[in-house]
Amino acid sequence: MSAKSKQYFNIFVFIISLIFFDQLSKYLVAKYVKLGSIYFSFFDDFFRIIHVRNTGILFSMGSNIHYSLKKIFFLAMPIFILIFVFYLSLKERNCIARISLLLIFSGGVGNVIDRLFRPSGVVDFLDLKFYGIFGLDRWPTFNFADSYVVIGMILFLVYDFFIKRKVLNK
């Protein structure tokens, strides 16, 4: 196997592993945790597993818009963006930047799969106490795909602000 083929194989395995873990966790929550109920909590209610559905996007924004507009804004547009992010990840030479883009891509695909095959909404289940920060008692419930996107964005910002700029300023 050539170095390029091995690199693409590793990217494929990374993406499939992340999407599989996300979809498996959502499947298990949807199957075994009653909608709206708390399955269990840890550390004095700091972390909970709770089954909710999100028909909107980030923090349930857009939940009330018309179904056909949702298909355009929450399905078609993200698919085009994901294709672009995947293309960028293949072109990127820096390992941190590539991993960050692949995390964003994998998380986006995980949630697009839910939008395609779960008409009742994306399965969210990770729930954290937020102690009144930003006026929130609890952070909006999320899933592993959401985590991949956020971690990928943070990694990319770190890369852009600290690594890429340092290289460009030399």
Curated annotation (Swiss-Prot):
Q: How does it sit in the membrane?
A: Multi-pass membrane protein
- Asked whether the keyword Heme is assigned, the reply is no
Which cysteine pairs make disulfide bonds?
none
Transmembrane region(s): 9-29, 72-92, 94-114, 143-163
Q: Where is the active site?
A: 124, 146
Q: Does the keyword Membrane apply?
A: yes
Pathway the protein takes part in: Protein modification; lipoprotein biosynthesis (signal peptide cleavage)
Q: What's one Pfam family the UniProt record gives for this protein?
A: Peptidase_A8
GO terms in the biological process aspect are: proteolysis
Catalytic reactions of this protein: Release of signal peptides from bacterial membrane prolipoproteins. Hydrolyzes -Xaa-Yaa-Zaa-|-(S,diacylglyceryl)Cys-, in which Xaa is hydrophobic (preferably Leu), and Yaa (Ala or Ser) and Zaa (Gly or Ala) have small, neutral side chains
Query: Function of this protein?
Result: This protein specifically catalyzes the removal of signal peptides from prolipoproteins.
Q: Which NCBIfam families match?
A: lspA
Family statement drawn from the similarity comment of this UniProt entry: Belongs to the peptidase A8 family.
Name of the protein this chain belongs to: Lipoprotein signal peptidase
Q: Which organism is it from?
A: Borreliella burgdorferi (strain ATCC 35210 / DSM 4680 / CIP 102532 / B31)
Name the gene for this chain: lspA
